[in-house]
Amino acid sequence: MRRMGQGLCLIIALGTTPVLAAEWKPPQGCRLEMTVQQRSCTVAQHYRCQADAPGDQWVAYFTQEGLVSQARIDAETRWMESTDLVSGITDRLDLEARDHASLSTLLKTGSDDFDFWTQSDTGERLRHIGRDDLTGTVEIDGEPLDSTRFSLRTFSEAGDLLIERNGTQFVSRDLGRFFGGVETSTDWTGETQETDDSPVRFIRPGEPGFGSTTPDYDCNMQMVGMPAGGGA
């Protein structure tokens, strides 16, 4: 499971004017390690900060509209905190969990079940129950990755199902983190959306495009949710 859902807005980017990209700089005391150009017209900046616990790492997501979200995971890829910069709401992991997500368990056994809570700074508590399974290996832009299948259900504190997500993702053993893939999500109203956040290019320091905040892929496509059962 992607450890921090991007929560990105749907974008219609037809006819947009290209903007000259500047190299993004992480906060003071932090080091930008990799820029990842993704499908769905998004680009991710992966960085680490000296003040954090060993193994913690951050990601900042950009669309054509700018910085939209940022998140921190730990060495086990647990959701430590996530901020939607459009709404301004931050969610944090409740450290008391029935079954924390564990990257080491997934890589050792091939599967990992999880059942944990997050709480927002507005007081909303959400329960997340799901599973990750390894399904094979793949190489994208020279980066060796394990492919995964995941399922995730998110419930309100009262026990109502709010959203169900199923799909495929990728995990890097070297980098210790997940990358998005193709997924289907259905909310409590029955509305279904299909998205593809798969990585396309992994860009390291010194390479062209490192730190760029301008997405390169799928930006001339109309990104819309498809109703269940198909339809125009």
Question: Language-model features: where?
Answer:
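Extended soluble regions of mature proteins
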Residues: 143-231
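Bacterial N-terminal signal peptides that target proteins for export
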Residues: 1-8
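Short, surface-exposed coil-to-beta transition loops
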Residues: 44, 66-68, 125-133, 162-168
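Extended beta-strand-rich segments in extracellular/periplasmic secretory proteins, especially
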Residues: 101-160
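Short, flexible beta-strand-to-coil junctions
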Residues: 61-67, 120-121, 174, 182-188
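An acidic-aromatic
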Residues: 51-109
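N-terminal signal peptide c-region/cleavage motif recognized by signal peptidases
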Residues: 16-18
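N-terminal cleavable signal peptides for secretion/export
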Residues: 20-59, 102-119, 226-232
